């Protein structure tokens, strides 16, 4: 069942030891970050975030083949955040499924302004190793005025070092781009590499549930506050 058939976040929007966490990357923007705080929206023009390892950019139809290795891998499914997504598991059996998902993501970006789906491009391999989704949530629960970050990675990259580097690259810039006071992402108890990366990156585990559109309570969220 493809992502395109189920991910309707637009309706929700309207309603080893590692070194200590270093200073968060403010991001190398393709455009002036201050401009996004003023007259321009991320939905008008999507910037890129870059460091020496990764490039974070708007998803492109040409990413489909690389992403089949992510969404076509059943071992990756438990790490995808399907909260409030109407029971989807996001497994894509074919290249066509991925292509349809990308079409849907781009419609949500360009037409509905529901969320932004970013590709995570490895500068070392020159391939796309996963995606990030980000949107600003408005709701009558703890996660109001909160950026919800969804992280979908290939299983080879579900590692503490990789996730930490991605979080360090995007967390603060995403709060700026989306005008959020805080940012949150899900990490279930079995996602040990992800949880370690979140702790190192300055996120804290929260007990408060995210309450879905149908009243379902979702747990295992980690949050960072904007300075």
Where are these regions (language model features)?
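Conserved acetyl-CoA-binding loop-helix of GNAT-fold acetyltransferases
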Residues: 160-173
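Conserved hydrophobic beta-strand within the GNAT/NAT acetyltransferase core sheet
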Residues: 183-187
